[in-house]
Amino acid sequence: MLNVSIVLYNPDWKQVTTLTRALLECSHVRRIYWVDNSPTLQEPPVLSNQVKYIFNNQNLGYGAAHNIAIRESIYDDIPFHLVVNPDIVVTSDVITTLLQFIQQHQE
């Protein structure tokens, strides 16, 4: 089980939606956080109740924005959290392989 965070700034919603749909196909993904550092509130598409949109109303920076989602994962006792950029391409088998590797190499 893992959560995923994607930091956004004036996002290309088509790109974000494509990535999010691919992540949602993976049974290991519990929640996806869209953390938006854009200067104005955007109307995000609704894809799933597994996606949480967080609008910061300012550009906190890449790391600080991901930390918001990571804190939620810690609070929810999710053992793993994946930090990704919105322009990557993934498949569910990649997430499964990554999670298996992490579980086998926790040192």
Describe each model-derived feature in a short phrase.
Residues 29, 78, 105-107:
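Short, high-confidence coil segments that cap the C-terminus of an alpha-helix
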Residues 1-6, 22-23, 31-35:
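Hydrophobic targeting segments
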Residues 93-107:
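Conserved donor NDP-sugar-binding/catalytic core segment of glycosyltransferases
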Residues 57-75:
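Glycine-rich, basic loop-to-helix element that forms the pyrophosphate-binding segment
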Residues 37, 56, 84-86:
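Active-site acidic Asp-centered loop
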Residues 34-44, 58:
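A conserved acidic beta->alpha catalytic loop
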Residues 77-89:
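Short beta-strand-to-loop acidic/aromatic patch adjacent to the donor-nucleotide binding site
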Residues 11-25:
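Short, well-formed alpha-helical segments that are part of the catalytic scaffolds
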